[in-house]
Every structure is written in C-alpha cells, then in structure tokens.
A protein has these predicted regions:
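Class I S-adenosyl-L-methionine-dependent methyltransferase catalytic core
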Residues: 1-97, 101-161
Length: 161
C-alpha cells in the first residue's frame, strides 16, 4: 500500500482534471497524442467554453480559480483516452462511457455532445447517447448564484468505424 502523501503525489503526477492539480504537457507525455490534442484544439464549442471560464476567473467570478485548468485538463485527457481506444479497438468494437454533464459559472457544459463530437473526429461512430432518468443537480455553490438546473447523466454508445 501507499500512504496519503504518496497517493497525493501520484494523483498530482497523473491527472490535471482536478481543481488542485497542475496542468500536464500531454504531448511531452506522448507525442503520438498530437491528433487528439488537435481535435480538442479545433472543437469550437470546447474552446468557447474554455475562454468563458478563463474570463470568469479573470473577473474573480469563480468559486475556485482551478476550474478552467480542471475543465481543460478533463477534456484534453479524455480526448487522449478516446484516441487510444480508437487506436486499439478492432473495427466494429463498441466503446461505452457513462458521464454527467456539468455546470460552472452558470454555464451548462454538454459533456455528452462535446465528447461524442470529438469521438466522431477520432474514428468512432456515435450510435446512441442514452439519457438516464433523474438528472443530477448542480453544486450548492452554483445553486446559490445561478439556481438549480437538472443536468443530464448519459451513457454514450460509440462504435469503432
């Protein structure tokens, strides 16, 4: 086993999609991820969301300054996972993912749509996005400022093209 300090070190080393973690240079970790990084860079809605969150940080309107880095890290790291799945799966194989949409600074982020569009660019056909019953709510920080909004929890069904 490992102690809490070692677990924290590993988490910091491996992930950037938490508010306390530093951004990672994904291309330094694996130069073969360039097509994945390019797909995320080209996704206009994702870039608009990241720009919005950065502006909210600059205006001191976020409850945590790490949110823009965390959201960027999540989408870029997940894009690399999707890229790797497309690389190793056989033609016709299914890739299924369960995920929640999220809301930051009053802006709902349709994670299901964004990731499915990116998956389509990286070699998957989007077969279905199944919406699970009882959408989750947003955080108490969001509700206090922006009200409650039910967010979709979905199952993505993609097939390797």
């Amino acid at each position: 086993g490992i102690d809490e300090k070692e677990l924290s070190r590993l988490r910091q080393e491996m992930l950037s999609c938490t508010v306390e973690n530093r951004a990672k240079d994904l291309l330094a970790l694996n130069p073969a991820w360039k097509p994945a990084i390019d797909a995320a860079d080209r996704h206009q809605l994702l870039q608009t969301i990241l720009t919005y969150l950065k502006s909210q940080k600059e205006l001191d309107l976020l409850n945590n300054d790490g949110i823009p880095r965390m959201v960027r890290g999540y989408f870029y790291e997940t894009t690399c996972v999707i890229f790797e799945a497309a690389r190793v799966l056989k033609h016709g194989a299914y890739f299924i993912m369960v995920n929640d949409n999220v809301r930051y600074a009053g802006a709902s982020i349709s994670v299901d749509i964004l990731l499915s569009e990116i998956a389509g660019q990286l070699g998957f056909e989007v077969e279905q996005i199944l919406v699970l019953p009882n959408g989750k709510g947003n955080s108490s920080q969001q509700m206090g400022m922006h009200g409650r909004e039910a967010l979709r929890k979905c199952v993505y069904v993609w097939r390797k093209a």
